Amino acid sequence: QFKNIDNKQALAAIGQPKLMRIYDEVFESFGLQVAQCLLTYHDFEKEATIENTKNPIHTLLKHEIIPIINENDTVSAEEIIFGDNDKLSAMVAKIIGADILFLASDIDGVFDKNPHLHSDAQLITKITNLEEIEKFIEEKPSKLGTGGMTSKLKAAQICFENNVEMYIVNGNQNNFVENALTGNIPCTHFQKK
């Protein structure tokens, strides 16, 4: 029933405020305030739109307000078909000058084989050259989104081109940011040589 683009856009419009309510409640329990930033890939095409995207994010961060950034699926038919938040997050990391990007997924990182299909898959903990790992990628979309491992590698490419470190971590792990940085959880760290 909801397979065509118009219906998916309508569902996005219904779901977005519900999602933001959840974020608001969770962050508020830690004494933090959030703001919603809905973006499209067109926001990254011209210098003027890049500035219009970057400036509010910087202002929110300056005031210690956490921007919740998501694709604006209600108006972006292309992104419903092709989009993912992995690439979008890398593009945002680029324009705001981030040092590190964390991609929270349903797996611990990049494996030499798809861990959903192969029980003997081995985690690759450090990646300094994207070409070396492309042969390992077997696509399986994330359970929670449209972005599978290929989209994460596209995000890594953007990060490599802009000297942004990137981690793929299991978002179900407690304190995954701190624990990834200190090496206390399995994850994949991308850092260009």
Where are the regions that the model predicts?
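C-terminal catalytic "cap/lid" subdomain
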Residues: 1-193
